[in-house]
UniProtKB/Swiss-Prot annotation:
Parts forming coiled coils: none
UniProt cross-references to PROSITE patterns, sorted A to Z: SER_THR_PHOSPHATASE
Molecular function via GO: metal ion binding; protein serine/threonine phosphatase activity
Alphabetized Pfam families for the sequence: Metallophos (PF00149)
Domain of life (superkingdom): Eukaryota
Gene name of the record: PPH21
Protein name from the UniProt record: Serine/threonine-protein phosphatase PP2A-1 catalytic subunit
Active-site residues, record numbering mapped to chain: 178
Cofactor, free-text remark: Binds 2 manganese ions per subunit.
Family from the record: Belongs to the PPP phosphatase family. PP-2A subfamily.
Top EC class for this record: hydrolase
GO cellular component: a single term: nucleus
Modification after translation (UniProt): Reversibly methyl esterified on Leu-369 by leucine carboxyl methyltransferase 1 (PPM1) and protein phosphatase methylesterase 1 (PPE1). Carboxyl methylation influences the affinity of the catalytic subunit for the different regulatory subunits, thereby modulating the PP2A holoenzyme's substrate specificity, enzyme activity and cellular localization.
Length: 369
């Protein structure tokens, strides 16, 4: 299993991956000098976009007007065309009034299809929905990392948020470590918003919205789903329910760990090479599953070449849903279907052909960061 060595921004780590495919848009645009004047300390302050200034006291109730608007946005986005800045503002305000009422541990019923990292690979996201079935016919659970690295983070996160608002009980979007103000400044989403909108306003809206994403989900009280992994400060799922998630991802602590940690072959807790979170061994995952009467921990956060990988004697599964990650890693992607009887099936798929790009077979990566 390969570790995607994202690190907290305070460590001053720059992007480690050099794209080898020719694109009109560079992955990170390499335009920090031009963008420097656009950024200020205020950009890191939660709530600066104003999307949550007038939160509702009850969940959003869809009416015909809302439904028609959402359907138009989804149709527009399905063509890989970004929404206008005004429409992003409207969408994010609606999404706040859905997400703020979801729990830290979102209960999910079976059947459900569980998905890993997407990372701005919009055409591959559409392929995912072809493989797994359209929403709302299929009940989906996404485990975070919708933005950064890929070329279409704006369209990807807009599409998933629009689907969430349109079908709030048929799609769940958890927070990943990349749904963060600090990480998105380093790995592409911030620059993409500047490039496509000419300002940081859309970036502010979405990063404010990320604070409201639930951080874990529990499928039929048996499968614990989250982006990263376990925390030495969390022994029970009830402790996750008590966390204050409406904030920027902290640099340390239990919320940070849930979004950053990784399983490891070594037992116990270890220092993570990422600089945030921990590594945890089979003894830790077995004890957590036993304490909480779980059958499985499902998580994302790491590239796995076949799209999924078991660890810790099948106490943990990693799911990765971005094929040919960063358009060069040569991996397959996968999603995991869980049926009414808790039977699990993995559906693997290769990258979708992007418009204007020739079809190429998967290749072995030269290296991985």
């Amino acid at each position: 299993m390969d570790t995607d060595l994202d690190v907290p921004m305070q460590d001053a780590v720059t992007e480690q991956l050099t794209p080898t495919v020719s694109e009109d848009m560079d992955l990170n645009n390499n335009s920090s000098d031009n963008n420097a004047e656009e950024f200020s300390v205020d950009d890191l302050k939660p709530g600066s976009s104003g999307i949550a200034d007038h939160k509702s006291s009850k969940p959003l109730e869809l009416n015909n007007t809302n439904i028609n608007q959402l359907d138009q946005w989804i149709e527009h986005l399905s063509k890989c065309e970004p929404l206008s800045e005004d429409d992003v503002a409207r969408l994010c305000k609606m999404a706040v009034d859905v997400l703020q009422f979801e729990e830290n541990v979102k209960p999910i019923n079976v059947p459900v299809t569980i998905c890993g990292d997407v990372h701005g690979q919009f055409h591959d996201l559409l392929e995912l929905f072809k493989i797994g079935g359209p929403c709302p016919d299929t009940n989906y659970l996404f485990m975070g990392d919708y933005v950064d690295r890929g070329y279409y983070s704006v369209e990807t996160v807009s599409y998933l948020v629009a689907m969430k608002v349109r079908y709030p009980h048929r799609i769940t979007i958890l927070r990943g470590n990349h749904e963060s103000r600090q990480i998105t400044q380093v790995y592409g989403f911030y620059d993409e918003c500047l490039r496509k909108y000419g300002s940081a306003n859309v970036w502010k809206m979405f990063t404010d919205l990320f604070d409201y994403f639930p951080i874990t989900a529990l499928v039929d009280n048996k499968i614990f789903c989250l982006h990263g992994g376990l925390s030495p400060m969390i022994e029970t799922i009830d402790q996750v329910r008590e966390l204050n998630r409406i904030q920027e991802v902290p640099h340390e602590g239990p919320m940070c760990d849930l979004l950053w940690s990784d399983p490891d072959d070594r037992g116990g807790w270890g220092i993570s090479p990422r600089g945030a979170g921990f590594t945890f061994g089979q003894d830790v995952s077995e004890q957590f599953n036993h304490t909480n009467d779980l059958s499985l921990i499902a998580r994302a956060h790491q590239l796995v070449m076949e799209g999924y990988a078991w660890s810790h004697q099948q106490n943990v599964v990693t799911i990765f849903s971005a094929p040919n990650y960063c358009y060069r890693c040569g991996n397959q992607a996968a999603i995991m279907e869980v049926d009414e009887n808790h039977n699990r099936q993995f559906l693997q798929y290769d990258p979708s052909v992007r418009p204007g790009e020739p079809s190429v077979s998967r290749k072995t990566p030269d290296y991985f960061l």
